[in-house]
Amino acid sequence: MTIIRKKHPLIKIINHSFIDLPAPSNISSWWNFGSLLGLCLIIQILTGLFLAMHYTSDTSTAFSSVTHICRDVNYGWLIRYMHANGASMFFICLFLHVGRGMYYGSYNMIETWNMGIILLFAVMATAFMGYVLPWGQMSFWGATVITNLLSAIPYIGTTLVEWIWGGFSVDKATLTRFFAFHFILPFIITALVFVHLLFLHETGSNNPTGLNSDADKIPFHPYYTIKDFLGVLILLMGLMILVLFFPDVLGDPDNYTPANPLNTPAHIKPEWYFLFAYAILRSIPNKLGGVLALILSILILALLPLLHTSKQRGLTFRPITQTMYWILVADLLILTWIGGQPVEYPFIIIGQMASIAYFAIIVIFMPMAGMIENNILDLD
């Protein structure tokens, strides 16, 4: 078995990636989320495949086909809710994974980090298009509002929006193409995940101290396979509690009403995992400015390696920057809350203050804190 594992051209790739991979001896449970994201992706592809067998991407039958899946298909309700709530678990793991990278300075592995940002954009695009497919009220109006933002692009905006719609409004052509893209993107994401891992294995994993761990490595299997397996059990337990007891808690009741272009919902809002970006978008009165802020709210992650001023890699021994980091986390929670609120006083001003704080903490306060800590510790 050892000979096959180390000599077979295909199996040796798996061996070098998941079995004999040298890993730091001190990585904590915060390093579990990579494997959990892989599990989420597998769950989403499998459940999505079975949903696609019964779904029809036509405006007249899309809503009915989802109802048919839940009522008539064997365990269709389970597959549908696993897919819907699996997306939420995916984003929880994604945010924690990115947060871990920010906390421990993993963004200094620039290729891996940039690949991760591309993956984040791809997953967000996939989730957005998936939300349109059930063709409920929030599906239709969410698609209308978000795609319409592209009309803010000077000169080509309106033409671009109509090209994406396949007509003069969100309609049959839009739904069909969104289904096609929603189906193909997870496979593209899978390919990008392998590139992400390829870049990661060029440098090796970071660790909580932020120091070079070449002198103290242990094999990935069995130590981290068993540790990952515990994470898998916790994730699956959380997902199944959500699916079996609270399947609609993260959804929007409006999406149980079939799409009606003549009736606008009182509050149009995306799924909870986009609310922070949606709040930033709404905080700027100018349409183009809002769209740029929306894109920058994610793209700003690419600037983190340039904004790193500290002589230390992670925040483990940096109390001032730690404080800034946790204020940023609280700020993101406030933005998520604001994104789900109506556009009225006092939510408008809270959203604007939280949006300014979000960019200010990342661009100004965290780099300043890094320099102050260098000074205090005489690391200049």
From Swiss-Prot:
TM spans (from-to): 33-53, 77-98, 113-133, 178-198, 226-246, 288-308, 320-340, 347-367
Subunit comment: The cytochrome bc1 complex contains 11 subunits: 3 respiratory subunits (MT-CYB, CYC1 and UQCRFS1), 2 core proteins (UQCRC1 and UQCRC2) and 6 low-molecular weight proteins (UQCRH/QCR6, UQCRB/QCR7, UQCRQ/QCR8, UQCR10/QCR9, UQCR11/QCR10 and a cleavage product of UQCRFS1). This cytochrome bc1 complex then forms a dimer.
Pfam families linked: Cytochrom_B_C (PF00032), Cytochrome_B (PF00033)
Cofactor: heme b
The gene coding this protein: MT-CYB
GO cellular component, one term: mitochondrial inner membrane
InterPro entries attached to this UniProt entry: Cyt_b/b6_C, Cyt_b/b6_C_sf, Cyt_b/b6_N, Cytb/b6-like_sf, Cytochrome_b, Cytochrome_b_C_euk/bac, Cytochrome_b_N_euk/bac, Di-haem_cyt_TM
GO molecular function, one term: ubiquinol-cytochrome-c reductase activity
Superkingdom of the source species: Eukaryota
S-S pairs: none
Family: Belongs to the cytochrome b family.
Keywords: Electron transport, Heme, Iron, Membrane, Metal-binding, Mitochondrion, Mitochondrion inner membrane, Respiratory chain, Transmembrane, Transmembrane helix, Transport, Ubiquinone
Identification of the protein by name: Cytochrome b
Membrane topology qualifier: Multi-pass membrane protein
Extra remark beyond the main annotation: Heme 1 (or BL or b562) is low-potential and absorbs at about 562 nm, and heme 2 (or BH or b566) is high-potential and absorbs at about 566 nm.
Protein residues bound to heme b b562: 83, 182
Chain sites annotated for binding heme b b566: 97, 196
